């Protein structure tokens, strides 16, 4: 990292997978590109899958260098402010599937910034800047209003879906959020129980007192509450009992390694079991192949999302995708 290495890395070790997972996390935290980590003896098929990603990584780096994808240092707070006010940042939607019957049941709204000059800017490039500059509330309001408008439009076309919307720690400090969101849902003729507020473990910890208040009020108004990236933060089991969450989302870092890493597999299985015992729905994100889908189905995970199902897409593509999905899903059932 100190020498500015841009090569894609594959970590291998004969040590236990816990040590390897820590090394992988440290490498990523230092800005290194890590395709994956595998334990010895090496599984050839796993290694081949990782090596197949190299051309994609190289292509991404070429695109980054050409300026189509940009770092947050490449644009200003003024540009971001203008983007929010002009509607350049829009929600894209990633479908979520119910594993019991493979039905299309919901979407997660994800922010995408279509810059008029610099092209598509991913959320990890501008969300931190929005938080640092105080724009996150304005951005969140825009995302929520656009997302609910799309959900309402789909509903008029006889497609009723749940929608999950991400909220930051700063937004959770706003005691007016529950009333605002309830009014917005009512104005769109939507039901509160079809709207899920997603928060990360770290978000809850950042503003613990206000977060508990706001989350409790949201739940009392009928909204679903999801703890995102479960297993990657530092929350205790006590918090799961104290906060009225209705859903757990297993972080994709565990899901993607479930087939090759026994510890990740155990975490996935245990999380599904924990959610079931706490009467919470469990969602697995980052499903990228049929084998992982089948594993999660065997564990009785409730819902999944990931590139194997569909990549995030603009709202105007959802109706067409919904029409196409049943024929695709029929190949995975039976």
What residues fall within each predicted segment?
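His-Asp phosphorelay/catalytic-motif detector in bacterial-type signaling
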Residues: 3-10, 31-34, 137-138, 160, ...
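CheY-like receiver
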Residues: 44-52, 56-84, 330-334
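Alpha4 helix (beta4-alpha4-beta5 surface) of REC/receiver domains from two-component response regulators
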Residues: 2-8, 15-36
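EAL-family c-di-GMP phosphodiesterase catalytic domain
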Residues: 14-15, 33-51, 60, 169-173, ...
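Charged helix-capping and loop-helix junction motifs
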Residues: 179-183, 209-214, 262-269
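Hydrophobic/aliphatic anchor position in the core parallel beta-sheet
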Residues: 9, 163, 245-248
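Bacterial c-di-GMP phosphodiesterase EAL domain
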Residues: 72-190, 202-203, 216-217, 237, ...
